[in-house]
Amino acid sequence: MNISGELRGVSIGGGSTIQDAVIIQNMGESGITTLKIGSNCKIGRRTILSSEGDACVNIYDNVSIHNNCVVIGSVEIKPFSILSANIFISSGNHYYRHVPHRLIMRQDKEVAELHLSSGVRSTVIDEDVWIGWGAVILNNAHIGRGAVVGAQSVVTRDVDPYAVVAGVPARRVGDRLKFLPRPEISSHNLEDWPYFYEGFLHLDPESEIILRGFRFRDFVSVILSQRLEYHFEFSCSTLLKAVDNIKSIKINGKDCSFAESKDISDVVSVCVPLQFLVIDRNGSNNAFMLSVIFHSSFDSGMYLKSVKGVGVVA
């Protein structure tokens, strides 16, 4: 292993294995940790991990990176993700079209510095992602939880959770899981866990994504608290306005009964034609069970967001 730059700016967790000829370059400011490797990670032979300036390479716990990979710039790789061999991941891109008559080397450097000064986001690989042999991830792409990237693909845009993408440029060719709305979901059922993951989105073709939200025929937000029950039919505008007053909620409106909550800890957004919903949290061990009972047919899908744990309220 070859560690280049300020050693004190590199953090390696316990139980991690760094194999032969790995190069770790921390080119950030002296004394600032900009390259982090979590616990129980595996870094394969001849892999290069490089951070520079304010950019941080952050590899979370239980990540496996195979031989001959390059990870450079501002990159996050979250737990239990697998990178096959010969993968290139960067938060940047190259620029050659802004001033075509200038040398590519010069305009690329100038435009890249301009993008960095404006705060370019990181490239993010979420939990449980599998990236195939020889893939390239560029342009601050965000690979959603559970996604699969095919061998030798070039990813330049975000990938949805549990999607399977392949090609140059990478396009969606399938889904790892088929998220069909269920009449009931429970955190105690392993097959239902993906429905609780932040970022999961199930849309039917008629649903429309709009600025700062989603437009569904039915839309309601559910609050996780110590103990909470809902029993209502829909009033979209009333419910959305009520969620803004987050300290203590009492929902009343057209076709609605009421719902009260105190000490709100989290919000789950549900977009689905449902009629009855119960949340019951056991305060003694912080465990909770979420049951969603649908009274009508499924034609608008479901969207769950911002649950901080599966079966546990953080």
Predicted regions and their residues:
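Flexible, glycine/small-residue-enriched loop-and-beta-strand segment within the central core
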Residues: N2-I137, V168, R176-L177
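Short loop/turn segments at connectors of secondary-structure elements within structured domains
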Residues: E6, G31, V71, L83, ...
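Short strand-turn-strand beta-turns centered on an Asx-Gly dipeptide
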Residues: P79, S248-C256
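C-terminal/domain-terminus segments
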Residues: W133-A166, A170
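Short, solvent-exposed loop/turn motifs
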Residues: P169-R172, D255-S257
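Glycan-recognition and processing domains
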Residues: F179-H231, S237-I246, A259, V267, ...
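Extracellular carbohydrate recognition and processing domains
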Residues: C256-S284
